[in-house]
């Protein structure tokens, strides 16, 4: 019988970013209680030796599973050190991988209060409107001019510590393009 390979997307992440993610998740699960329905699985509870942790985030009937890995093949840079993250959406027997932006939007829809574009309509109808968004990472696009005007009137309150963003966890802060020097040291 032949070997059958299964390929999955694993985002290379440095270990300090993974530590920050884990501590933010635990803080909002146990201290602030904003993520009290989330489930954190430690490395010693996982049957796979490369999984360092799993966070199960219920989304209605489905759930989002964010797995962190260690001991993977090292990346191009020394600081990658074989750490990684995979993000999976599961519903019953079906599962698929999602990108960090979509994961943040899904988390935002289910868990955190938001002052969204629907707030304009609610305010006109005289309904009570949430005056700020607790989870800015869940917004991937620029809002309408009305939305931007209303958000300019109400300054967003900084939440300490910040809410755990999957996009921020997988962000590549090391490989930003560098400015090169051209003729006689002038930056191009």
From Swiss-Prot:
<keyword id="KW-0945">Host-virus interaction</keyword>
<keyword id="KW-0597">Phosphoprotein</keyword>
<feature type="modified residue" description="Phosphoserine; by host">
    <location>
        <position position="144"/>
    </location>
</feature>
<dbReference type="Pfam" id="PF00559">
    <property type="entry name" value="Vif"/>
</dbReference>
<keyword id="KW-0014">AIDS</keyword>
<feature type="region of interest" description="Interaction with host APOBEC3G; G-box">
    <location>
        <begin position="40"/>
        <end position="44"/>
    </location>
</feature>
<feature type="region of interest" description="Interaction with host APOBEC3F; F1-box">
    <location>
        <begin position="14"/>
        <end position="17"/>
    </location>
</feature>
<feature type="region of interest" description="Interaction with host APOBEC3F; F2-box">
    <location>
        <begin position="74"/>
        <end position="79"/>
    </location>
</feature>
<keyword id="KW-0862">Zinc</keyword>
<keyword id="KW-0833">Ubl conjugation pathway</keyword>
<feature type="compositionally biased region" description="Basic residues">
    <location>
        <begin position="176"/>
        <end position="188"/>
    </location>
</feature>
<protein>
    <recommendedName>
        <fullName>Virion infectivity factor</fullName>
    </recommendedName>
</protein>
<dbReference type="GO" id="GO:0044423">
    <property type="term" value="C:virion component"/>
</dbReference>
<feature type="binding site">
    <location>
        <position position="133"/>
    </location>
    <ligand>
        <name>Zn(2+)</name>
    </ligand>
</feature>
<dbReference type="InterPro" id="IPR000475">
    <property type="entry name" value="Vif"/>
</dbReference>
<keyword id="KW-1032">Host cell membrane</keyword>
<feature type="region of interest" description="Interaction with host APOBEC3F and APOBEC3G; FG-box">
    <location>
        <begin position="54"/>
        <end position="72"/>
    </location>
</feature>
<feature type="modified residue" description="Phosphothreonine; by host MAP4K1">
    <location>
        <position position="96"/>
    </location>
</feature>
<feature type="short sequence motif" description="HCCH motif">
    <location>
        <begin position="108"/>
        <end position="139"/>
    </location>
</feature>
<dbReference type="GO" id="GO:0030430">
    <property type="term" value="C:host cell cytoplasm"/>
</dbReference>
<dbReference type="GO" id="GO:0019058">
    <property type="term" value="P:viral life cycle"/>
</dbReference>
<keyword id="KW-1043">Host membrane</keyword>
<keyword id="KW-1035">Host cytoplasm</keyword>
<comment type="function">
    <text>Counteracts the innate antiviral activity of host APOBEC3F and APOBEC3G by promoting their ubiquitination and degradation. Acts as a substrate recognition component of an E3 ubiquitin-protein ligase complex: mechanistically, Vif hijacks a host cullin-5-RING E3 ubiquitin-protein ligase complex (ECS complex) and the transcription coactivator CBFB/CBF-beta to form an active E3 ubiquitin-protein ligase complex that targets APOBEC3G and APOBEC3F for polyubiquitination, leading to their degradation by the proteasome.</text>
</comment>
<comment type="similarity">
    <text>Belongs to the primate lentivirus group Vif protein family.</text>
</comment>
<keyword id="KW-0694">RNA-binding</keyword>
<feature type="region of interest" description="SOCS box-like">
    <location>
        <begin position="151"/>
        <end position="180"/>
    </location>
</feature>
<dbReference type="GO" id="GO:0003723">
    <property type="term" value="F:RNA binding"/>
</dbReference>
<feature type="site" description="Cleavage in virion (by viral protease)">
    <location>
        <begin position="150"/>
        <end position="151"/>
    </location>
</feature>
<feature type="binding site">
    <location>
        <position position="108"/>
    </location>
    <ligand>
        <name>Zn(2+)</name>
    </ligand>
</feature>
<keyword id="KW-0946">Virion</keyword>
<keyword id="KW-0479">Metal-binding</keyword>
<feature type="region of interest" description="Multimerization">
    <location>
        <begin position="151"/>
        <end position="164"/>
    </location>
</feature>
<feature type="modified residue" description="Phosphoserine; by host MAP4K1">
    <location>
        <position position="165"/>
    </location>
</feature>
<feature type="binding site">
    <location>
        <position position="139"/>
    </location>
    <ligand>
        <name>Zn(2+)</name>
    </ligand>
</feature>
<comment type="subunit">
    <text>Homomultimer; in vitro and presumably in vivo. Interacts with viral RNA and Pr55Gag precursor; these interactions mediate Vif incorporation into the virion. Interacts with the viral reverse transcriptase. Forms cullin-5-RING E3 ubiquitin-protein ligase complex (ECS complex) by interacting with host CUL5, RBX2, elongin BC complex (ELOB and ELOC) and CBFB/CBF-beta. Within the ECS complex, Vif interacts directly with host CUL5, ELOC and APOBEC (APOBEC3F and APOBEC3G) substrates.</text>
</comment>
<keyword id="KW-0472">Membrane</keyword>
<feature type="region of interest" description="RNA-binding">
    <location>
        <begin position="75"/>
        <end position="114"/>
    </location>
</feature>
<feature type="binding site">
    <location>
        <position position="114"/>
    </location>
    <ligand>
        <name>Zn(2+)</name>
    </ligand>
</feature>
<feature type="region of interest" description="Membrane association">
    <location>
        <begin position="171"/>
        <end position="172"/>
    </location>
</feature>
<feature type="region of interest" description="Disordered">
    <location>
        <begin position="166"/>
        <end position="188"/>
    </location>
</feature>
<dbReference type="GO" id="GO:0020002">
    <property type="term" value="C:host cell plasma membrane"/>
</dbReference>
């Amino acid at each position: 019988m032949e070997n059958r390979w299964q390929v999955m997307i694993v985002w290379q992440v440095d270990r300090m970013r993974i530590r920050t993610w884990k501590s933010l998740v635990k803080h909002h699960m146990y201290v602030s209680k904003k993520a009290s329905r989330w489930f954190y699985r430690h490395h010693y509870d996982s049957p796979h030796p490369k999984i360092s942790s799993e966070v199960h985030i219920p989304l209605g009937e489905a759930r989002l599973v964010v797995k962190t890995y260690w001991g993977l093949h090292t990346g191009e840079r020394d600081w990658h050190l074989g750490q990684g993250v995979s993000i999976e959406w599961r519903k019953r027997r079906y599962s698929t991988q999602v990108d960090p932006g979509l994961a943040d939007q899904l988390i935002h829809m289910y868990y955190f209060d938001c002052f969204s574009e629907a707030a304009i309509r609610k305010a006109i109808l005289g309904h009570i409107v949430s005056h700020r968004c607790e989870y800015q990472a869940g917004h991937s696009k620029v809002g309408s001019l009305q939305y931007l005007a209303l958000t300019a009137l109400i300054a967003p309150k900084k939440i300490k510590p910040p809410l755990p963003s999957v996009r921020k966890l997988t962000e590549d802060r090391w490989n930003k393009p560098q400015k090169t020097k051209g003729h006689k040291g002038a930056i191009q």
